[in-house]
């Protein structure tokens, strides 16, 4: 079994054992990453169309209502890492971050007619980014989705 298959199997298990039971019980579920992350990272070594085929079950079974992508320039990520201190994780290296960001952009471009993708500018301070996220979500829900969101 190759890594692509393992990620797809893990996604199916996550849906069946964690996400669906929570949704069926009426809980609101927020996920970080979900299948978009797998696609973005794996496009470094795999064809996106192949990845979409291998993950078709997950996408048919449980699609998110909306995807919020906080887009931060890799150079800014490096500055934030330096400010926080400590060593960068493997995936936090600037060049790899550029490639992964490109992967996300490819995924979002390919899926823009199939998914509700909200790209939020991640520059600035935490309060600014949070305000942009809430604004994007509010705009999405006001556009016709019968849901209401409230800020904590």
What label would you give each PLM region?
Residues 33:
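Walker B catalytic acidic pair
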Residues 38-103:
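A glycine- and Lys/Arg-enriched "phosphate-lid" helix/loop adjacent to the NTP-binding pocket
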Residues 20-21, 58-60, 109:
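Short secondary-structure boundary/capping segments
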Residues 30, 66-68, 118-120:
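Hydrophobic/aromatic beta-strand patches that form the interior of the parallel beta-sheet core
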Residues 7-29:
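Phosphate-binding/switch loop-helix module in NTP-utilizing enzymes
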Residues 1-3:
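Short, small-residue-biased leader/transition segments that mark boundaries at the very start
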Residues 25-27, 64, 116:
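Short coil/turn segments at beta-strand junctions that form active-site/ligand-binding loops
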Residues 75-152:
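NTP-dependent small-molecule kinase module
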């Amino acid at each position: 079994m190759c890594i692509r298959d393992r990620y797809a199997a893990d996604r199916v298990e996550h849906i069946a054992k964690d996400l669906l039971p929570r949704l069926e019980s009426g809980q609101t579920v927020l996920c970080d990453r979900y299948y978009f992350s797998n696609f973005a990272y794996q496009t470094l070594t795999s064809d996106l169309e192949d990845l979409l085929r291998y993950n078709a079950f997950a996408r048919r079974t449980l699609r998110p209502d909306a995807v919020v992508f906080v887009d931060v320039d890799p150079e800014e990520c490096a500055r934030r890492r330096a400010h926080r201190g400590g060593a960068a994780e493997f995936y936090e290296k600037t060049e790899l971050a550029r490639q992964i960001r490109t992967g996300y952009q490819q995924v979002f471009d390919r899926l823009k007619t199939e998914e509700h993708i909200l790209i939020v500018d991640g520059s600035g301070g935490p309060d600014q980014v949070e305000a942009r996220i809430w604004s994007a979500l509010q705009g999405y829900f006001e556009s016709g989705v019968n849901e209401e969101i409230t800020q904590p």
